[in-house]
Design a protein with these regions (language model features):
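Divalent-metal (Mg2+/Mn2+/Ca2+)-assisted nucleotide/phosphate chemistry catalytic cores
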Residues: 18, 98-221
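Active-site rim/loop-helix segments in enzyme catalytic domains that contact anionic ligands
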Residues: 66, 77-115
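Buried hydrophobic packing segments
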Residues: 61-65, 178, 201-209, 298, ...
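Short acidic, glycine/serine/threonine-rich loops at helix termini
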Residues: 87-91, 136-142, 230-234
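Short, hydrophobic/aliphatic alpha-helical segments
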Residues: 38-47, 75, 176-186, 227, ...
């Protein structure tokens, strides 16, 4: 039987960093019953595998799952292999493109490989929601759909806005909140975690559990982590994500590129540093040193202490002593995708002319050529140590060359 901490201690621990608990008295009651019976709570968070590899934005919820796990409760890491085929419409102004089952399963495999970088295998259930949805018949879906109304669905801000703007809302999108809510019924969740943008879906889970004769789950929302741009939420589709499997130097360099203001938010959501200590650092620490400490902590969490030290040393050599890093990430880029015809730059000495905006996109620095053009105009790009402001540049055709965008560096080779 697990040994649980006093209820007040548990509440204080799980509330850290949260935005809203619906409802806190219910959570207290569930914790009291758990303490009295010795039965752990079932705490759920769902992740649709719409892209390969988890990123730091995902870990905000995963770290909160770990907090419940630290207290002795059972956590459920739910992979939405079925809901991923529907596509979460949250925050979308248009219907998401559908992914195939094969794509989703390939992505899901990477999630399964990475989940235990944060969670303990002993008290983690990894589940797939196709486990129950593939068994549902048409009549079951009609019964589920009867649990809500179109007018209730249109209360969602994104659906309401699209309806007002006369933009299409596909019928399958209306099923997404119901499907997510039904997950909670099937898992008998006591608590569900989600980002603030998921609040509507989480509340549907409460209503469905009640409709199916279960005690309603408590909803705990967490902040959305902004990506490297400091504006949009972290997402691979926005090109502003830091993957938890990225090489140590790449991860360290990306973290060093965030703004000083965003750094404190990362401290709060991605580390166990207490708020009192964060406030003291804001007053006393030099921002550069605080950012180095943040980057070192996060690289250590997902790699090792040795990798963290090495990444910091290589980054310092590169940016503070103007040396090339020993372990810059190497990427290959198809030559035909970036080269151009240019008598001025192309020559017979082993060099070739390339379009820099195309290279930045193909090498994974940016998500679009437009963003690449903006980086060039911002004087944020250097090739082999030389800042570049022209759209076309000459690079070695037969060997790798260093490209820097902000604090990120890669060794690029044309193939």
């Amino acid at each position: 039987m697990p040994k649980f901490a006093p209820v007040d201690e548990q509440l204080a621990y799980v509330k850290k960093g949260s935005v809203e608990i619906i409802r806190e008295p219910e959570l207290r009651s569930k914790l009291e019953k758990s303490l009295a019976s010795g039965t752990p709570l079932r705490v759920k968070a769902g992740f649709d595998p719409t892209a390969p590899d988890l990123h730091l934005g995902h870990t905000v919820l995963m770290r909160k799952l770990k907090h419940f796990q630290d207290l002795g409760h059972t956590v459920i890491f739910l992979i939405g292999d079925f809901t991923g085929m529907i596509g979460d419409p949250t925050g979308r102004s248009a219907t998401r493109p559908a992914l195939s089952a094969d794509e989703l399963m390939r992505n899901a495999k990477t999630y399964m490989e990475q989940v235990y970088k944060i969670l303990s295998p002993r008290t983690t259930e990894v589940r797939f929601n196709n486990e129950w949805f593939e068994k549902m018949k048409s009549a079951d879906w009609i019964k589920l759909a009867a649990k809500t109304t179109v007018s209730q669905m249109l209360e969602r801000e994104d659906f309401h806005k699209r309806f007002q703007d006369e933009k299409p809302i596909a019928l399958h999108e209306l099923l997404y909140p119901l499907a997510q809510g039904y997950d909670s019924v099937m898992l008998k969740a006591d608590v569900e975690l989600g980002g603030t943008d998921q609040k509507f879906n989480l509340l549907v889970g409460r209503e469905l559990q009640r409709a199916y004769g279960q005690e309603s789950q408590v909803v705990l929302t967490m902040p959305i982590l902004e990506g490297l741009d400091g504006v949009q939420k972290m997402s691979k589709s926005y090109g502003n994500a830091i993957g938890i499997k990225e090489p140590p130097l790449e991860m360290y360099g990306k973290l060093m590129s965030i703004s000083d203001e965003m750094m404190w938010r990362y401290y709060e959501l991605l580390t166990d540093v207490q708020m009192s200590e964060i406030e003291q650092m804001k007053r006393d620490a030099h921002p550069m040193q605080a950012k180095k400490d943040l980057a070192a902590r996060i690289v250590k969490d997902f790699h090792s202490a040795e990798a963290s030290v090495k990444a910091a040393e290589d980054w310092a050599k590169q940016f503070q002593k103007n040396e090339a890093p020993a372990a810059a990430e190497e990427v290959s880029v198809p030559a035909e995708a970036v080269t151009v015809e240019s008598q001025d730059l192309a020559s017979s000495n082993g060099s070739c002319a390339i379009r820099l905006d195309k290279l930045l996109k193909e090498a994974g620095f940016v998500s679009s050529r437009t963003e690449g053009e903006r980086k060039i105009k911002e004087v944020a790009v250097a090739v082999e140590g030389q800042t570049v402001t022209a759209p076309i540049v000459s690079v070695p055709a037969n060997k790798g060359f260093l490209v820097r965008v902000g604090k990120r560096v890669k060794r690029v080779r044309l193939v």
